[in-house]
Regions:
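A short, charge-rich alpha-helical start-of-domain segment used by transcription regulators
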Residues: 6-30, 34, 43, 54
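Sigma70-family region 2
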Residues: 9-10, 50-67, 86-88
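Amphipathic, non-transmembrane alpha-helical scaffold segments
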Residues: 21-25, 73, 113
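Conserved catalytic core of Hanks-type protein kinase domains
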Residues: 23, 35, 52, 74-75, ...
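Structural recognition of an alpha-helix C-terminal capping motif at a helix-to-coil junction
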Residues: 30, 44-51, 66-78
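Arg/Lys-rich amphipathic alpha helix in sigma70-family domain 2
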Residues: 74-95
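Internal acidic/polar
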Residues: 90-113
């Protein structure tokens, strides 16, 4: 949280960020866990969401506003989906590499002249 606060400019925005963090962190974590089914990855998603919040504090409404809550849930969903996609791409690459034959063929690469 301290590192994220360094991304926020004014003292007023810092106070608002702390309130957002304290009030919505667990809700955001629940949203991310529901998508990712992995607590550690969900924490990463919430962290990424708060990075976006810190970068765009001027666009974030007051903590008690329903629109602010919806905004935080939306960016958390997007962060979790991004992590889900990255994880699936990585897993599919690992599967592909595992399926390759273990030959000792020599591969020669010829650079274009």
């Amino acid at each position: 949280r301290v590192i994220l606060l360094m991304m926020v400019d004014t003292p007023e925005e810092k106070r608002k960020f702390v309130i957002l963090y304290e009030n919505y962190r667990y809700l955001m974590l629940k949203v991310a866990v529901d998508i990712l089914r992995d607590y550690q990855l969900a924490e990463d998603a919430v962290q990424e969401a708060f990075v976006q919040v810190a970068k765009h504090m001027e666009n974030v409404g007051q903590p008690e506003e329903t629109a602010t809550k919806r905004y935080l849930i939306t960016i958390t969903k997007h962060a979790a989906i991004d992590i889900y996609r990255r994880r699936n791409r990585l897993q599919s690459r690992e599967i592909y590499m595992d399926e390759l034959p273990e030959g000792k063929e020599q591969v020669t690469y010829m650079a274009p002249e």
